[in-house]
Amino acid sequence: MFRKITSPPLSAINRVLLVGLYWLSVGLFFSVTAGAEQLKFKKAQSESGVLFSYEWLDMDSTRQSISFELPHTAIKAAPTQQANYRPKIAQRYVTVALMEEAKKINPKEARVKIIPKRDSIDIQVKGANEDKVEAILSNLKAVQREAYNAYLDEHYFTRFTTLFNQKAIKPDHTRYATESVKPLVAASQAFYEKVNAQSDSRAYFSLILSWLQSIPYDTLEDRVVSNGSGYAPPINVLMQNVGDCDSKAVLASSMVRAFLPSTKMIMVFLPNHALLGIALTPMVDDRTIVHDGETYVLYDPTGPALIPFGQVSEDTERYIVTGRYQVEAVD
């Protein structure tokens, strides 16, 4: 009995990845003329942590400033691995797992060959007992799936279905956001303490949005070809003082979650952009979307356009109106 299977081609996964990550490649499409301006950024090391200091102009052109210290322990606890999906490395990871499993098989029962190819992995099983061959092949297929899932998890990737219903791989943005909440509590607290005690949550959002939008925007020459390597986890955005739309969206999600630990939140993905939604009571002029029966007020931390809380750009509005967006819940 001879059975052979060919794994899903990793090069094909990579080709879809390029499509799946297309929304990460953002052009500055905002029609708003007012731009955020960071006036000062300073980062200083201390025995206990890293002190961050900022000055910027808010939406009213008022000079704002803030400082906060992130303890070394918090920085160490936060995910800092930057995503860069490489199909060949993923293939090698899976191949090693398959070969280790194949070593456990008694050669008297079956002969197994694991053959990595350019864009696939062939699994060949030969043996006299058909049922045994089928069982071995089934087990190896399970090992293959588990190994690939382990690779994705270890490197902070997740599966993603594009608006074109294509399967893809992307950084696990919501996981980055969730695992960065506790490390960023001190940063979120600094903004909370700066807002007037009598103000509502919108004052917090206005302040933190103007700060996020003033952080320099990272325009990559060819983000698609980079396989997602332009993405920076929240701590990295702070350390490097630069970030693109998805990087800033995840940073914002982490800090807002620390401020509102139980309020429902979402990330909204457009073909060329990413923004956020929060389940607060909307005002008359707020741009909202409904997801799973819940109404979310939209906000966009990208910058440098100064877009107020509850408002979106004209391009974003066109995508929302036509339903060309996808939603992921933030835990």
Predicted feature locations:
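N-terminal secretory signal peptides that target proteins for export/translocation
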Residues: 1-15
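Generic detector of N-terminal low-structure segments
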Residues: 4, 31-32
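Short, isolated positions within intrinsically disordered regulatory regions of eukaryotic proteins
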Residues: 5-7, 27, 60, 215
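General helical structural elements
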Residues: 7-8, 19, 252
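Bacterial N-terminal signal peptides
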Residues: 19-29
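A structural boundary/capping signal
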Residues: 34-331
